[in-house]
C-alpha cells in the first residue's frame, strides 16, 4: 500500500481481513475514487481463493510464499501451491498479470497451474538470478539504517530505510514486481518506502549490553 500510494489513492485490507468475510468487507468499503486496491487473500482449504479471486477480479495477483502453514487441510506442500494458485482464477487470462516468488520450492508447480489456467502474463521476483525483480543485497549502515539493492530486468534500484526484519526486504521485491507490472516509475515507490517503519512490536531495534 505504501508504494502504490505514491501513484494515487490506494485502498487496502485492514488487519487480517483476508478470508471469505474480510475480503467482501474490504471490497464493499472501497471508496469510489480509489485508483489502486491492495486486497490480501488468505486460505485454509481448497476452493477458498478461487471464490475470493472471482469476487475481486484482480488485475495483478501475487503469490508471496507457499509453506506448510495450512498442511492440516492438505496432503502436501504441492497441494497447498495448487490451492494458492486459485488466486489467478478470477483474472482476465490475456490482460491479468500473475506474479510468483521465484525462490519458493513449488515454483515449477505454480507455473504448471498458471499454464493450465491459460494466463498469458507471468512475472517473478526473488533472490534467484533469473527473477524479473531481484533482491540483490542488504547492508547495515553506521547510522542504523539499511541499504537495500534490487535489480529490475537488469536495472539497479537502491534505497536506504530504517532497519527491518530480513524477510521484509524480500517482500519489497514482490511489491516492486507489482509496480513493474503496472508500468509505474519504480523511483516513486522507492522514495515512498524509504520512510517505512514496521508495526509496533515488529522489527524494533533493541540495544543490549555486551554479554
Regions found by a protein language model. Give the residues of each.
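Adenine nucleotide phosphate-binding catalytic loops in nucleotide-utilizing enzymes
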Residues: 78, 116-211
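Phosphate-binding loop of NTP-binding sites
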Residues: 1-102, 108-119, 173, 182
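Heptad-repeat coiled-coil segments of the DHp/HisKA dimerization-phosphoacceptor module
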Residues: 103-104, 152
Amino acid at each position: 500500500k505504501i508504494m502504490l500510494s505514491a501513484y494515487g489513492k490506494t485502498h487496502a485490507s485492514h488487519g487480517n481481513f483476508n478470508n471469505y468475510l474480510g475480503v467482501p468487507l474490504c471490497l464493499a468499503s472501497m471508496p469510489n475514487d480509489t485508483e489502486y486496491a491492495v486486497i490480501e487473500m488468505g486460505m485454509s482449504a481448497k476452493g477458498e481463493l478461487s471464490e475470493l479471486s472471482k469476487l475481486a477480479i484482480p488485475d495483478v495477483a501475487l503469490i508471496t510464499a507457499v509453506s506448510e502453514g495450512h498442511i492440516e487441510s492438505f496432503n502436501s506442500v504441492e497441494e497447498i501451491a495448487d490451492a494458492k494458485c486459485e488466486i489467478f482464477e478470477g483474472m482476465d487470462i490475456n490482460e491479468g498479470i500473475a506474479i510468483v516468488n521465484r525462490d519458493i520450492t513449488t515454483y515449477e508447480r505454480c507455473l504448471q497451474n498458471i499454464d493450465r489456467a491459460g494466463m498469458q502474463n507471468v512475472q517473478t521476483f526473488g533472490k534467484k538470478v533469473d527473477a524479473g525483480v531481484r533482491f540483490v543485497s542488504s547492508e547495515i549502515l553506521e547510522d542504523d539504517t539499511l541499504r537495500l539493492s534490487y535489480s529490475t530486468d537488469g536495472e539497479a534500484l537502491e534505497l536506504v530505510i530504517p532497519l527491518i526484519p530480513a524477510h521484509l526486504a524480500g517482500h519489497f521485491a514482490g511489491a516492486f514486481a507489482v509496480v513493474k507490472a503496472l508500468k509505474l516509475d519504480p523511483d516513486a515507490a522507492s522514495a515512498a518506502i524509504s520512510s517505512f517503519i514496521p508495526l509496533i512490536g515488529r522489527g524494533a531495534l533493541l540495544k543490549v549490553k555486551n554479554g
